[in-house]
Design a protein with these regions (language model features):
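Transmembrane alpha-helices and adjacent helix-loop boundaries
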Residues: 1-188
Length: 188
């Protein structure tokens, strides 16, 4: 939202605080999107939280920070995609900036970004398997435990793949229902 507000400022009318926050947001997005998630997780577990042994929580934090950068850009793109005339229309109706964003711009942006947000959530869901690398306990970690006891790799890994596939299929189905429901509101 900060980046969108900064990008939509009129020339000559600049808010210095918005400029500072925009710079911080740009650095955050650039650094996080420009480095592999595996490296980020290793930095979180081996450098930042060196003394902590709660690897699952470190993994969740790392995944959240990584996904946040992508979600921020998805939201920014969705807000920028809404025609500027919508903001002017809201203002001409007497709505202030916040009400115009809340009642006019954001509902349109949500419809535009829903597929991309769904894809980001699916990627995040599948990336949870990377937590195993730093010692976090999750689905792949459990499969590795089974493989260590049974010396069988194929069935535990296929089982994990099937569980992830079912979770993704359920989420995709729910997302499709939500998209259809939002499309119905367009027809009214």
């Amino acid at each position: 939202m900060i980046r969108t507000a900064h990008d939509q400022q009129r020339p000559g009318v600049r808010n210095p605080f918005l400029g500072l926050f925009n710079f911080i947001a740009k650095v955050y997005v650039t650094v996080i999107r420009g480095t592999p998630m595996m490296v980020q997780l290793l930095i979180w577990s081996s450098v930042v939280f060196l003394s902590s042994r709660s690897y699952t929580m470190i993994g969740i934090l790392g995944l959240g920070i990584n996904s946040g950068a992508y979600v921020a850009e998805i939201i920014r793109g969705g807000l920028m995609a809404v025609d500027g005339g919508q903001m002017e229309a809201g203002r001409s109706l007497g709505l202030n900036y916040m009400d115009t964003m809340r009642f006019i711009v954001i509902p349109q942006a949500i419809k535009a970004i829903l597929p991309a947000l769904g894809n980001e959530f699916i990627i995040l869901l599948k990336d949870t398997s990377l937590i195993t690398v730093i010692g976090g306990k999750e689905l792949l970690y459990a499969a590795q435990g089974i493989m260590g006891r049974t010396y069988e790799a194929m069935f535990p890994l296929i089982g994990v793949a099937c569980v992830y596939l079912v979770m993704v299929m359920i989420f995709t189905w729910l997302l499709g229902k939500l998209e259809r429901r939002l499309r119905q509101s367009d027809r009214r």
